[in-house]
């Protein structure tokens, strides 16, 4: 018989630098998960992605064991990196804070494809372009 799921927790943590401090400790501690085990495993699996924010979905079972699935970095994070900016525009309709090329959009869409509900690369690119527009990033080329 399969283990009974107690909770599912979604977190966004820096790759290779998770600590038992908030938000990890309180989120997992309230479900009785051994926090240090999670932190150690997460940091091992994400060490090669240092500097990025990696979303993780932690499934916690009744016996206090857990499994987790790593997702791709948020599109906004990847766009900020590609455009070389710190943060998006406060008023994206009037203010443009950076530029990305269609080729950069294609690369981001290919990376994000497993986590997007798009059937093909073109649809994924349109989603990423929409995110860029909402951040005040201009898509050129």
UniProtKB/Swiss-Prot annotation:
<keyword id="KW-0694">RNA-binding</keyword>
<keyword id="KW-0699">rRNA-binding</keyword>
<dbReference type="GO" id="GO:0070180">
    <property type="term" value="F:large ribosomal subunit rRNA binding"/>
</dbReference>
<comment type="function">
    <text>Forms part of the ribosomal stalk which helps the ribosome interact with GTP-bound translation factors.</text>
</comment>
<keyword id="KW-0689">Ribosomal protein</keyword>
<protein>
    <recommendedName>
        <fullName>Large ribosomal subunit protein uL11</fullName>
    </recommendedName>
</protein>
<dbReference type="InterPro" id="IPR006519">
    <property type="entry name" value="Ribosomal_uL11_bac-typ"/>
</dbReference>
<dbReference type="GO" id="GO:0006412">
    <property type="term" value="P:translation"/>
</dbReference>
<dbReference type="InterPro" id="IPR020784">
    <property type="entry name" value="Ribosomal_uL11_N"/>
</dbReference>
<dbReference type="InterPro" id="IPR020783">
    <property type="entry name" value="Ribosomal_uL11_C"/>
</dbReference>
<comment type="similarity">
    <text>Belongs to the universal ribosomal protein uL11 family.</text>
</comment>
<dbReference type="InterPro" id="IPR036796">
    <property type="entry name" value="Ribosomal_uL11_N_sf"/>
</dbReference>
<comment type="subunit">
    <text>Part of the ribosomal stalk of the 50S ribosomal subunit. Interacts with L10 and the large rRNA to form the base of the stalk. L10 forms an elongated spine to which L12 dimers bind in a sequential fashion forming a multimeric L10(L12)X complex.</text>
</comment>
<keyword id="KW-0488">Methylation</keyword>
<dbReference type="GO" id="GO:0022625">
    <property type="term" value="C:cytosolic large ribosomal subunit"/>
</dbReference>
<dbReference type="GO" id="GO:0003735">
    <property type="term" value="F:structural constituent of ribosome"/>
</dbReference>
<dbReference type="Pfam" id="PF00298">
    <property type="entry name" value="Ribosomal_L11"/>
</dbReference>
<keyword id="KW-0687">Ribonucleoprotein</keyword>
<dbReference type="InterPro" id="IPR036769">
    <property type="entry name" value="Ribosomal_uL11_C_sf"/>
</dbReference>
<dbReference type="InterPro" id="IPR000911">
    <property type="entry name" value="Ribosomal_uL11"/>
</dbReference>
<dbReference type="InterPro" id="IPR020785">
    <property type="entry name" value="Ribosomal_uL11_CS"/>
</dbReference>
<dbReference type="Pfam" id="PF03946">
    <property type="entry name" value="Ribosomal_L11_N"/>
</dbReference>
């Amino acid at each position: 018989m399969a283990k009974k799921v107690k909770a599912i927790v979604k977190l966004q943590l820096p790759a290779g630098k998770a600590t038992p401090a908030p938000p990890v400790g309180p989120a997992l501690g309230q479900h009785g998960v051994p926090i240090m085990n999670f932190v150690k495993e997460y940091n091992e699996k994400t060490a090669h992605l240092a500097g990025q924010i990696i979303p993780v979905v932690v499934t916690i079972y009744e016996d206090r064991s857990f499994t987790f699935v790593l997702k791709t970095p948020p599109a906004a994070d990847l766009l900020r990196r590609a455009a070389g900016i710190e943060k998006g525009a406060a008023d994206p309709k009037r203010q443009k804070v950076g530029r990305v090329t269609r080729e950069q959009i294609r690369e981001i869409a290919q990376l994000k494809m497993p986590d997007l509900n798009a059937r093909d690369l073109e649809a994924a690119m349109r989603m990423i372009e929409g995110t860029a527009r909402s951040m005040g990033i201009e898509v050129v080329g």
